[in-house]
Amino acid sequence: MYAYPNELGRYGEFGGKFVPETLMQPLKEIEQAFNELKEDPAFEQEYLSLLHNYSGRPTALTYADQLSAYLGGAKIYLKREDLNHTGAHKINNALGQALLAKKMGKSNIIAETGAGQHGVAAATVAAKFGLSCTVFMGKEDVERQSLNVFRMKLLGAEVIPVTSGNGTLKDATNEAIRYWVQHCSDHFYMIGSVVGPHPYPQIVSEFQRMIGDEAKEQMLKKEGRLPHKVIACVGGGSNAIGMYRAFLDDEVDLIGVEAAGKGIDTPLHAATITKGTKGVIHGSLTYLIQDEFGQIIEPYSISAGLDYPGIGPEHAYLHASGRVQYVSATDQEALDALKLLTEKEGILPAIESAHALAKAFEMSRTMSEDEIILVCLSGRGDKDVHTLMNVLESEGKTK
């Protein structure tokens, strides 16, 4: 029976708290509040009510019949997190942490964001709960995701562009943590993925677990059996953990797809487990992309939500234990998968989600028609239209 993390916030050897002394007490307070509230039926009811009435859960499980027929292999089902309010799975966690912050008496939210989806979700729940919101976002991502930046500002959030490093998610997270150290008395840091020091990976995992819980129930209702493979994209890894949680004790192949960028044999990728080694990043022992001197190597992906140089400690454990297989998809493979799903099913996925789709399509062709693949469609692609337009038009691939 799967039972992690332990009382020290460890997943095997991974996880833990590697933070400045000034953050040990705030983390302890968050852990204590979370442990109390997750056992409180009133808190659970309030959270579930918000998911249902505000975010629109449960999300659909869609059989991609046209796509499955075209590929000629396994039946492909999509767990439609793109149908959530704000367009991705990020709202699940944001609502839970906003409730936690409010119960703790915090009036200000700090968040980091890459693709902008967690930033939008944080700004959305801050508006809903009457909290102030400060979002740190890498300068590169601000430019790539200008529409989401505008949405955050429209929702009343302050967006702070981060110019250090590559100006991406890692750098935004660094600045958000620095800011929190200085303002932890009245600010709540709302981490957007299953990363960071304990108890954050556990908190985010708990607030995303309904993805897999719903999908499992829906699959049994539709097919009367479990899928053969469950596939999700992995950056920090929250949509994947949310999907995997329900299947960890079942005989189901679990597959995580990292961003291979221009190729894992080039320096331009974000394939942390495929190419990384053990180290500490943002308060947690995990795998990360680093050089022989322990310096972070800047990750790259066409997807702003996947170019993180680390990975959640639970993923590190699931890799080390062999329970989950981690593979990677290139920019081009993701773009091709995105176009194919859009053309065959009329569903425009986020570029992040398209990495999972790419591997699902590849694996489907080697499987029989009575086998099932379940893919987590973590978000919609509206935010990526500008990027897609530039890339595909330059390649002459739009019709």
UniProtKB/Swiss-Prot annotation:
UniProt keyword Ubl conjugation, yes or no: no
GO annotation, cellular component aspect: cytoplasm
Top EC class for this record: lyase
Protein EC: 4.2.1.20
The keyword Amino-acid biosynthesis appears for this protein: yes
Keywords associated with the record: Amino-acid biosynthesis, Aromatic amino acid biosynthesis, Lyase, Pyridoxal phosphate, Tryptophan biosynthesis
Cofactor(s) named in the record: pyridoxal 5'-phosphate
The protein's annotated pathway: Amino-acid biosynthesis; L-tryptophan biosynthesis; L-tryptophan from chorismate: step 5/5
InterPro entries, per database record: Trp_synth_b_CS, Trp_synth_beta, Trp_synth_beta/beta-like, TrpB-like_PALP, TrpB-like_PALP_sf
Family note: Belongs to the TrpB family.
Record's protein name: Tryptophan synthase beta chain
Phylogenetic lineage: Bacteria, Bacillati, Bacillota, Bacilli, Bacillales
